Amino acid sequence: MNSSDERKLRELGEAINYNAYGDSVADLAVDPVDMYRAIQPYSDPLDFIASTSVLPELQTRRTEDLELALGLVEVRRLANATLHILPDAAWARRVRGDFANLVARRDPARAHAVLTAGADGRYTGSVRAPLDCPRGADVLCRKFGGNGRVAAAGIEGLDRARLDEFAAAFSIAFCGESWGAGGR
């Protein structure tokens, strides 16, 4: 396979994966049933890419969502971490994990949490441990009803009344002393 085809397939996989993010089907750029119907007639994904506008449409949506997140106003810069709070909007729910990965790559020495506000007064969030020391995200998230992997984890249903408690725990979760005898 040539590198151009490999790139196209990677981009298609990333776009389809991105389309799965959100809290409900209404948040998605393309309904999964419609996505299936668009893909199903093609036995070769490269033919699908060449014959439809699905890939560029999803790439555009992802780019637009990231641009909206980058323009957000509410950011709390804590001692060892950065807390980003996104609004109650479909684009914010779609971009939450992707944006967490982006800010983690841009500032690998810090931990990052991206929370989206919900209409019910609760937050859903993606937490990334510092890329320079990728551990502890799972431990933090379990304290707030979430779970995940050591470097990347999430929470659901964080009550607004607990936001400051989460911010305080998040601020200290990734400092050197929190690692115990093993250190960083």
Describe the function of each predicted region.
Residues 1-80, 87-89:
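A structured phosphate/pyrophosphate-recognition subdomain
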Residues 82-184:
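Glycine-rich, acidic loop segments that terminate in or are immediately followed by a histidine
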